[in-house]
Amino acid sequence: GNGSTMGGVIVDAGNFDWSSGKFPEFTTPSDGYHGLVLHDVLGPAAYIAKVRIEGLRDLGAAISPFNAFQIIQGLETLEIRMKKHSENALALAEWLEAHEDVAWVNYPGLKSSKYNELAKKYLPEGQSGILAFGLKGGFDAGKTVADETKLFALVANFGDSKSLVIHPASTTHQQLTPEEQASTGVTPDLIRLSVGLENVEDLKADLQQAFDKV
């Protein structure tokens, strides 16, 4: 629950079409394997093969005992934490959507989202604590807000019990050209929030005081 360990379980039925054009990592030559095109050789098994030949190689076959302990400990409160993450994120997204300084908000729980029907179908209990938005002031406004928050921590992590903020265009993606940033979905104004478990009114107040400094 504190973002200190990440882990998961992969289940692959082996019947997904990876050649749809949306997954170039399976249909283009792999530099790490002498130009091998995974889908050409393995078809639907391309995904699980990539997990084994790259994930297993880079991350190892088993997590450490301490990380396993942290995951088990976190699972004890996962359900109640996810409900709070989702409730806070939806409330914050609705507040941002109505804010005069905000140009756009991307959160699938919003009724205005083009993904809302899918979100309700596949994520009926809540749509997570991750959301993104952009300010009308563009790049400079986004960077200022990320720098000026007090309750939100400025880090590239996500999924923590505490709220996190980042302005990708000036941090994680700053080495990319504007065209490369755009190809990854990063716009100059984009601010990503990982909404934590704090009182949502405190989170709104923190963002507002940062907006006021733009």
Regions found by a protein language model. Name each.
Residues 1-130, 134-161:
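Active-site C-terminal subdomain of aminotransferase-like
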Residues 81, 147, 163-214:
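PLP-dependent enzyme catalytic core of the Aspartate aminotransferase-like
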